Design a protein with these regions (language model features):
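Intrinsic-disorder/low-complexity, polar/charged segments enriched in Ser/Thr/Lys/Arg/Asp/Glu/Gln
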Residues: 36, 42-49, 129-131, 148-150, ...
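A structural preference for long, well-packed, hydrophobic secondary-structure segments
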Residues: 117-122, 168-173, 180-184
Length: 187
């Protein structure tokens, strides 16, 4: 946080200085990428995504790529005439993927450890608009070189109806590993 107690923007602040491009290019901050460390994670910090409408074409493309041909997501006739919602659903895997992708920070020091408590709370239909709120829930030292951070993802549709919830565990590099030498779990 800065002196005004506001969260500072971390997108593109520093470069990762790649060695396989000209120096003058490598010095330019990387767009849509972050380089925060474990020590920089603020428990309670939230971000909200832009909204995103899910179209029929992309829903069918996602279904085909994932081989999800369930009648609720791929059969208009079934969904309309025999299904309990009278219209086609967006695949839950797509809502999960899009929901998390909307707030992906592309941090070069963070690595996915897994997901907990994934719940599909309400259906999402073709043409619905979704957005996501991500919250840093907790962090704890875990390994010699990185700690574990738990974040929640809440995906909403329309004017704030929650449709998906999950918690993401990710390991994040320490800026100063020596500060955690007596705090992480020993094997």
């Amino acid at each position: 946080m800065n002196k005004d107690n506001k969260f500072e923007n971390t997108v593109g602040i520093e470069s990762t200085f790649p060695k396989d491009m000209p120096n003058e290019h490598g010095e330019i901050p990387v767009w849509n990428s972050e380089n925060w460390f474990y020590e920089d994670v603020i428990v309670g910090h939230k971000i909200r995504s832009l909204r995103r409408t899910i179209s029929e074409g992309e829903a069918m493309q996602f279904n085909c790529m994932g081989l999800d041909m369930h009648p609720y997501v791929g059969d208009e006739h079934f969904a309309k005439n025999e299904g309990m919602f009278q219209k086609r659903l967006v695949a839950g895997a797509m809502v999960f993927s899009y929901g998390l992708g909307l707030v992906a920070t592309n941090c070069v020091n963070s690595f996915s450890y897994g997901y907990d408590r994934l719940r599909f709370i309400k259906p999402v239909f073709i043409g619905d608009t979704i957005y996501t709120i991500r919250t840093n829930m907790e962090k704890k030292p875990k390994y010699e070189k990185m700690g574990l951070v738990r974040t929640s993802y809440e995906v909403f549709k329309g004017e704030g109806e929650i449709v998906l919830y999950c918690e993401h565990l990710h390991s994040v590099l320490y800026k100063k590993p020596e500060d955690f030498k007596d705090k992480y779990e020993k094997k």
